[in-house]
Amino acid sequence: QKLCERPSGTWSGVCGNNNACKNQCINLEKARHGSCNYVFPAHK
C-alpha cells in the first residue's frame, strides 16, 4: 500500500486499488494524473 503523502496535500489516506486517491487528486487538485505526487513528479 502506498501512502499519498505528497506536498499538494488534500489526501491523507492510503492509495489502494480503488480510485479514491486518483479521483481526489484529479478532481480537487486538478492533477493531470491520478498520482498524488503530481506537484513534484520526481519526488516519491
Swiss-Prot record:
- Provide the disulphide bond pattern: 15-36
Location of this chain's protein in the cell: Secreted
Q: Name one GO cellular component term.
A: extracellular region
Question: GO biological process: any one?
Answer: defense response to fungus
Q: Which UniProt keywords apply?
A: Antimicrobial, Disulfide bond, Fungicide, Plant defense, Pyrrolidone carboxylic acid, Secreted
State if Transcription regulation is listed as a keyword: no
What function does the entry list? Possesses antifungal activity sensitive to inorganic cations.
Record's protein name = Defensin-like protein 1
Native species of this protein? Brassica napus
